[in-house]
């Protein structure tokens, strides 16, 4: 959304590390999409804050996408609804305009997530659904042993879930999202059981946190993981993940009703 900086001080590149890489590596997984749809319930007129390039819209609903100019909206396919040029903290809609609202993998890009969520709550009379990552769980992923700087960035830039629930108010539930083994949405935990994928630069570039570290970090990660895969060290520690159907890590759905 509006903010293009993370706590580490690096520009968030319009909240895409690399435009083509993000579009090819971040394809919404239908199983995760179903959880979001369930959380939205019967809402039909839905506000999508941080719509970006449009890959996460809910086509079965009347979706109003919102994102700032100069970010991913420029790459939205022409057949998708036109994006409203606005930021979460100052939405150009009257109170209670929408049946529901969602923010998917975007709240950590806002200048002021709490203010943005209060504004989303103001214009939404039904459920507000936020797909995000719980920062306190980010470092539990095995990648932390190979590229701690990347997950440190992820943990710092994601607001605490308790801050999100406080800003939303009302009745709030937080649900951990199981990430499928063959997840199509290429954030780092999507490769929990497919470590070889993270040796591909395009897979890493699909997650903007990698754009905030220098070449030395990326080269060290590549050497370490490649070596552990060749020696069998990774499989001795984490090989059970290769056949685990789903991984419950930091991904959560926050749902709030008035």
Task: Please annotate each region the language model reported.
Residues 99-112:
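A short SAM/SAH-binding and catalytic strip from SAM-dependent methyltransferases
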Residues 43, 98-99, 125:
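Local beta-strand N-terminus motif with an aromatic residue
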Residues 114-128:
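A short glycine-rich, Lys/Arg-flanked "PGG" loop and its adjoining helix->strand segment in the class I
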Residues 1-44, 55, 70-75, 127-160, 185-189:
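Conserved class I S-adenosyl-L-methionine
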Residues 89-100:
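A short acidic, Gly/Pro-enriched loop at the edge of an enzyme's catalytic core
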Residues 175-258:
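Conserved Class I S-adenosyl-L-methionine
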